[in-house]
Amino acid sequence: MGQEQAGEPSSAGSRLFTSYRAKETDNYVKKLEELGFIILGRSSTPEFGFKNISDAQIHGPVNLPNDVTRNAGGSSGGAAALVSSGISPLAPASDGGGSIRIPASFNGLIGLKPTRGRIPVGPSSFRGWQGASVQFALTKTVRDTIRLLYHMQTCQMESPFILPKLSKVSLEEAVRPLKIAFLTVSPIGGNVSESAIAATKKAARALESLGHHVHEISNQPLNGIEAMQSYYIMNSVETAAMFDSIEAGLGRKMTLEDMELMTWAIFQSGQKIPAKIYSKILAQWDQYSHQMAKFHESYDILLTPTVAEVAPKHGQFALSENLQNHLKHMADFDWPKQQELIWEMFVDSLDWTPFTQQANLTGQPSISLPVYRDEQGLSLGVQLTAAKGREDLLLHLAQQMEECSVFS
């Protein structure tokens, strides 16, 4: 999503847009075309990218290629399945809360979420989810990730988020020994599987053997529950704004029949959130960015699991009948109650993937690397997060780990 090509389908996983053809080509896709890439087609996502699995009703679930009883993840699940199954060596993807890194972890791929402002945006949208959503790709090799980042990066003056470009030298020169903090505790207090912990400790040992200074920490840099509550408020308001534009374009009001139930609930909740609350949570994101900048004065890198569990079974996050009934009547509740229901709607899937969203709020670069497979052959990645603008550190570490056969 956010990667439209003029004249080509762009449904965003929604029944509203099954016959829609993009009217213009996004700057991201223009850059790919300039670099000589051949665009094969579109891949599947959940409706409007709201989930960490890909199961849009108009397309059906996306299977994990090495276990078709499981989901490939989301929201860039179709892209991940394409690369993992060998159809393409890389696939464009977007990440608004882990949508590159989560399927990368499940599919044994490399998934980089670049710093906010690194990759071309517009002209249809310059501030996706207030900067939380960014574009990049899923790959199989660090070399491809480095080359793609170097050639795709931009200093885009019309964008609200602007970065100086990374030099070729900075992406190729040897890295000094880094200070790396690692933790395996969920930022929202949920369960983290033994496999996810084992993956993280394997990566920590490997990085230490490469000469880096690795320290286990117990305290989360940010308040994870508060951060996710702010994320859902943003998601709700941005969805309400999106449907306001859709209603204007179609000349009618939206109904539940136009969308999936989860989308309906998010849409309804966004219509009641006061503007002052939205302003406060965006200011809160700035404070999170400040807190992480202070954290990186002590540590160059934060290492965590990418996800808490291996890829989920199809239907694992099905909503209870009671919750579905509440969501159908979402408009009847005040906004605090609506947000409680949004939390309840997402909590099972959030427990599965609680580590990725914070980098979207702060704008930091973060990468998932494929370091572990469990006894069933299911992949789990680890996540490395650096200070804003320091993709070079992430990619140097990734390259070192790849060259030392840490990847699995």
What are these regions (language model features)?
Residues M1-G96, R205:
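Gly/Ser-rich catalytic/binding loops embedded in alpha/beta enzyme cores
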Residues M1-R15, A174-K179, V237-A293, T306-E309, ...:
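Short helix-loop capping/hinge segments that flank enzyme active sites or metal/cofactor-binding pockets
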Residues L16-Y20, S133-K140, S269-G270, L384-T385:
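Short, well-ordered beta-strand elements within core beta-sheets of diverse protein domains
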Residues K113-A203, V406-S408:
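A short helix-breaking turn/cap at a secondary-structure junction
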Residues A137, L378-A387, L394-L395:
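Short, well-ordered beta-strand elements
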Residues E194-S218, E247-R252, Y278-Y299:
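Acyltransferase
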Residues E340-S366:
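Alpha-helix-centered segments that form part of catalytic cores
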